[in-house]
């Protein structure tokens, strides 16, 4: 009983310290509170050392100093401690350098990047060996294999499908006859496809009659169940802190669960928040009427305070979405420093989208604005059955296959929406639904929201599926859902 009480007291004191730091990061750290905290732990600290600690604003650093000190901490001790080599993490974060450009040449480079990356994937498949350029195909007879980006799709008056594709040098019309299987395939403008067919020179301009359409697609993956203790990646999205409809009690219950004694909770090593972590302001007309917290920086400070209860050995990754305080156009950058500084050291920040490396596994994280477009473009896809839209993205190996629509894009020399590496796990959000699927061995989720039904959703007759925590085991096929929805 004495041991339990002592451990519980230290844990409570540590959480209160973290809250002191989070609350004070927006202004000046409370020197008096920190001195009292050191004194309560039997440690004296010099004024110079205190200045150093206030600069770093890290509760984990303070705890480590107290744990390893001999009762007195001076400035040199702090400097030696913070300069020690850091332990290597089991994750990698690389931040691409994406600058805002808007010239015609920048758009051209982006489409060239998309074509070259996806063309390389398509031509590496055995069925596309011997592919040639469109210019060469137009001079050929018989069967050809070409790769192109779709610029036009239409139906002829006779019910045939007409597709215009282009590569870096030329374009050609391809016809899918109405009695051929590929006529039923959904072809989107701007996607990159391979075509196997026969060239006809009978008309003024050569035409390819299509026998087969080849997509970049995801190869079938065999998940080797490793003999390894479970390591869980926990996924949530669309928290919307600051909104009057933010489900605060359920979010706190979820964080308490991660910090608790449940065996599954103890296996959570990573927590991913895939965008719209706050509600923001000015996102839509009269939004201020729906807000409990008007200041976006205060919204992030509140989120940071909720996350202090997440154990320090759990790495938290936070990504922006369309409600967050970054540019709307994708790829979205990480949060600015004034927001990042509000959070604890175990919180890392990702751009949107991002391919995260966790213990040798690829975890592709995307907020998911393009899912609205895919629902409109893919027959059978809807907000309650978002899996068809997600799988259409994986088939096309691009997070936003059709340019434009509801997904604004930044033109850049590199197209960061191409899915170059096959993911082990694919995480999305944005829709406020919850859907788990498996496509050719790629486990995916449309992560649950932590916001109740909004007035707009009522008008659209959409019922969100809130307050669900999805756990993926990195070393097996296991997927677990923890439901914190108290309205069921």
UniProtKB/Swiss-Prot annotation:
Determine the domain of life of the protein's source: Archaea
What's the EC number here?
Answer: 2.7.7.7, 3.1.11.1
Q: Does the keyword Hydrolase apply?
A: yes
Alphabetized UniProt keyword annotations:
DNA replication, DNA-binding, DNA-directed DNA polymerase, Exonuclease, Hydrolase, Multifunctional enzyme, Nuclease, Nucleotidyltransferase, Transferase
Which cellular components does GO assign to this protein? Answer: DNA polymerase complex
Gene3D superfamilies named among the record's database cross-references: 3.60.21.50
The record, for InterPro entries, names:
DNA_pol_a/d/e_bsu, DNA_pol_delta/II_ssu, Metallo-depent_PP-like, Pol2_small_arc
Residue ranges annotated as transmembrane are: none
Cite a single GO BP annotation. DNA catabolic process
Q: Its Gene Ontology molecular function terms?
A: DNA binding; DNA-directed DNA polymerase activity; single-stranded DNA 3'-5' DNA exonuclease activity
Q: Report which reactions are catalysed by this protein.
A: DNA(n) + a 2'-deoxyribonucleoside 5'-triphosphate = DNA(n+1) + diphosphate; Exonucleolytic cleavage in the 3'- to 5'-direction to yield nucleoside 5'-phosphates
One matching Pfam family is: DNA_pol_E_B
Which protein family is named in the record?
Answer: Belongs to the DNA polymerase delta/II small subunit family.
Quote the subunit structure annotation.
Answer: Heterodimer of a large subunit and a small subunit.
List, alphabetically, the HAMAP family matched: DNApol_II_A_arch
What job does the chain carry out?
Possesses two activities: a DNA synthesis (polymerase) and an exonucleolytic activity that degrades single-stranded DNA in the 3' to 5' direction. Has a template-primer preference which is characteristic of a replicative DNA polymerase.
Stated name of the protein: DNA polymerase II small subunit
Source organism of this protein record: Thermoplasma acidophilum (strain ATCC 25905 / DSM 1728 / JCM 9062 / NBRC 15155 / AMRC-C165)
Q: Which gene encodes it?
A: polB
